[in-house]
Amino acid sequence: MSYKVNSSYPDSIPPTEQPYMASQYKQDLQSNIAMATNSEQQRQQQQQQQQQQQQWINQPTAENSDLKEKMNCKNTLNEYIFDFLTKSSLKNTAAAFAQDAHLDRDKGQNPVDGPKSKENNGNQNTFSKVVDTPQGFLYEWWQIFWDIFNTSSSRGGSEFAQQYYQLVLQEQRQEQIYRSLAVHAARLQHDAERRGEYSNEDIDPMHLAAMMLGNPMAPAVQMRNVNMNPIPIPMVGNPIVNNFSIPPYNNANPTTGATAVAPTAPPSGDFTNVGPTQNRSQNVTGWPVYNYPMQPTTENPVGNPCNNNTTNNTTNNKSPVNQPKSLKTMHSTDKPNNVPTSKSTRSRSATSKAKGKVKAGLVAKRRRKNNTATVSAGSTNACSPNITTPGSTTSEPAMVGSRVNKTPRSDIATNFRNQAIIFGEEDIYSNSKSSPSLDGASPSALASKQPTKVRKNTKKASTSAFPVESTNKLGGNSVVTGKKRSPPNTRVSRRKSTPSVILNADATKDENNMLRTFSNTIAPNIHSAPPTKTANSLPFPGINLGSFNKPAVSSPLSSVTESCFDPESGKIAGKNGPKRAVNSKVSASSPLSIATPRSGDAQKQRSSKVPGNVVIKPPHGFSTTNLNITLKNSKIITSQNNTVSQELPNGGNILEAQVGNDSRSSKGNRNTLSTPEEKKPSSNNQGYDFDALKNSSSLLFPNQAYASNNRTPNENSNVADETSASTNSGDNDNTLIQPSSNVGTTLGPQQTSTNENQNVHSQNLKFGNIGMVEDQGPDYDLNLLDTNENDFNFINWEG
């Protein structure tokens, strides 16, 4: 039996040809859900629209209320106009106005008694009660308005209106000030909070205004902060009035974090104890700390001008007066301390110098010889001489130069001018004026000035007795002339009576071929054991007192300082401060002490021919002495005998030079004082052994040169400390006796002379290996008659 399914019924099972899919049912369900949600959203939108419509409907009602109020205001004005017309006896006008303004009133009813409520159909409104006045309220209001309007517009007005208007203006002005001060107080509070200085102070703007105006009032805030000043002054943080005339000062307050202010150190020459203006060792916070008030330039306890902006390392430093601009400023440590100085002589030009030379005559020409004393420190730890005069109360060590090589021409022979040596029976500077500028001026600056004036007075002098040695840069065949000429390219000193002591730190030649003395002798160790009488008791190494090629500028004796020389660095160390020396531990006493007789008339002493006395004493710790003194024509009398002076012939009859037979007589020895070939004198200059002249009668050496081969008191020869004759620049070998030069140049070992113009009237006395015992005088004294300081050209110290 077969069944046939009708496809028209939905509940029928589908045929097998159409498979059933579950995904279709899912899609149908999702679509139904979406439609349901959409319907809900549509309903919500509709509700919102309805609410908005209701709001728009309600808004016209509010506007209608405003319109009603406006209509009421207008009706109120109409009522006051009707009242004004009625009280003004304008009844017909009032009735017409009431009819036109829809003011229906019962005839005969007085509107002044108040509005009469009457029911109407919406066209009539209830009248408000009108203020009853005799002439109507509108009229009185109009009078007041018009009066004030005229007063405010400067059109006059009544007196009462003007007073009222001034009161109104004052109130408005006070309100404006109070409003601005309130804003300013808020700004100050904000700034204080930002700086961390706000302590919940309540600032009254009116009190702040009173403080700004200077009115005496109570403090505006409670004094909670120590830093706040009780005096009513503008606040510090005010951006308008914060320009102080003095720096702010912070008290030490641990609660507020302020730092203590260190007191300002007094100004002085020493800045080691003076710190910066702000203490950097502390962590400074807040406002900057000032050292106030600042002190101007003042004098320190020793009289030093000093301020807070200059650095001064000396305790007695004074600025030079009228210092030349072309000269180098002297180092602060080179200036002597507490040394009385003499005034610098007036300089003249070369023309005036030549005129004075012609007028002076032969005596002036003889005195115009350049007198210089150069000290060449060539050995290690050898100190420069300290010169002392009886007329002076001070001991002035020689100034020291710091220039090493190629010194300018102005500083070659006059590198340091504040030094001098005196040979005479009186202090020649006793009559000279003192110059305050020489005390602090640079020796280089003073030395570079123009030549000084010629000294008219002459002095008699004497030196110690020493062996004699003469050298000449030219060959043995040089022609001797009688005319005295100065070397070229040199400046002649005018104060011829003042020999200068010049310390040279090097032995180099400059652009002017200026010769510098130098010593090759080795100085003993100063720090070693003191010498004894049995072995090498001489005070200091070889000293060469010879001449200098260039005339030196005369200088007062009172501005000489003590110094030491370091040959390794080629620099000189002064006695004070961080100088240019390497070895600063050397502190030797005065090597040179020159004593002069009591002061007196120079011309009388010269005419009376009273012998002078010059004593050269070495410093403590030196062992040997080599001394060269260049003399002119003089009478030399030994101190051992006081016999009458005898005159020696210039040529022919000569004394045999006596030389000891020892190891020094060999020709190959470099340090020998004389050789077998040198025993025979040559030319007009005769050679004599000083031992032979020691006990002889007084001799006259017109133009002679003498050599000495002296021993120590213990007959111990010091070969290492002896110096040979100077070498010349010619072809000849080392000779003992040569024609004397113009300046009497005597060089140290292994040095040459470059001077072209020389004179034959000077003599060289070589004092070598002088027998000296510590704290005693020399073995020989030299008494010179008919001599003065002009007869000594140069004194060169070696060692």
Curated annotation (Swiss-Prot):
Keyword set, alphabetical order: Activator, Nucleus, Transcription, Transcription regulation
One term under GO cellular component: cytoplasm
Biased composition, class Low complexity, residue ranges: 41-55, 307-317, 341-353
LisH domain sequence ranges: 73-105
Result after altering R598P: In strain: Diastaticus / ATCC 60715 / YIY2-11A
Outcome of substituting P115S: In strain: Diastaticus / ATCC 60715 / YIY2-11A
Biased composition (Basic residues): 354-370, 482-497
An example Gene Ontology molecular-function term: DNA-binding transcription activator activity, RNA polymerase II-specific
Effect of A447V: In strain: Diastaticus / ATCC 60715 / YIY2-11A
Spans annotated as Disordered: 1-20, 37-68, 101-127, 255-406, 431-503, 568-622, 644-691, 705-758
Regions of compositional bias (Polar residues) in chain numbering: 1-10, 270-285, 318-340, 371-396, 460-480, 584-593, 660-675
Stated consequence of mutating C383G: In strain: Diastaticus / ATCC 60715 / YIY2-11A
Localization per Swiss-Prot or TrEMBL: Nucleus
A single GO BP: positive regulation of pseudohyphal growth
UniProt function note: Required for diploid filamentous growth, haploid invasive growth and flocculation. Putative transcriptional activator of FLO1.
Assigned protein family: Belongs to the FLO8 family.
Protein name: Transcriptional activator FLO8
Recorded name of the encoding gene: FLO8
